[in-house]
Amino acid sequence: MELTPREKDKLLLFTAALVAERRKARGLKLNYPEAVALISAAVLEWARDGRTVAELMHLGTTVLTRADVMEGIPEMIPDIQVEATFPDGTKLVTVHHPIV
């Protein structure tokens, strides 16, 4: 199976998000890469569902709370940018202050 670099990046992100999801389900606090992966994967899935950029910018802030991540992580992630595929093309989605 031949994958483009972009497809490989998406698979890596999705795998990291699965690990983060499982750790969160076990009650572990997420670290920086896990938090970014989980939020990014959620945004990509919602974009695939047909949500708008504005909706994704808001929904991205609802994935995790301070209680879900290690101390200091919310301050390390002022925003997350995700290149998502929409029905009308690819767009850059920026989620400001994703962990409240």
UniProtKB/Swiss-Prot annotation:
GO biological process, alphabetically ordered: urea catabolic process
Pfam family, one: Urease_gamma
Coiled coil: none
Subcellular location: Cytoplasm
Domain of life: Bacteria
Main subcellular localisation: cytoplasm
SUPFAM superfamilies reported for this sequence: Urease, gamma-subunit (SSF54111)
Protein keywords: Cytoplasm, Hydrolase
Catalytic activity from the UniProt record: urea + 2 H2O + H(+) = hydrogencarbonate + 2 NH4(+)
EC numbers, comma separated: 3.5.1.5
CDD domains attached to this UniProt entry: Urease_gamma
Recorded metabolic or biological pathway in which this protein acts: Nitrogen metabolism; urea degradation; CO(2) and NH(3) from urea (urease route): step 1/1
GO cellular component, as recorded: cytoplasm
GO molecular function: nickel cation binding; urease activity
InterPro entries reported for this sequence: Urease_gamma, Urease_gamma/gamma-beta_su, Urease_gamma_sf, Urease_subunit
Oligomeric form and interacting partners: Heterotrimer of UreA (gamma), UreB (beta) and UreC (alpha) subunits. Three heterotrimers associate to form the active enzyme.
NCBIfam families xref list: PRK13241.1 (NF009712), urease_gam (TIGR00193)
Family statement: Belongs to the urease gamma subunit family.
Protein name: Urease subunit gamma
Organism, as annotated: Delftia acidovorans (strain DSM 14801 / SPH-1)
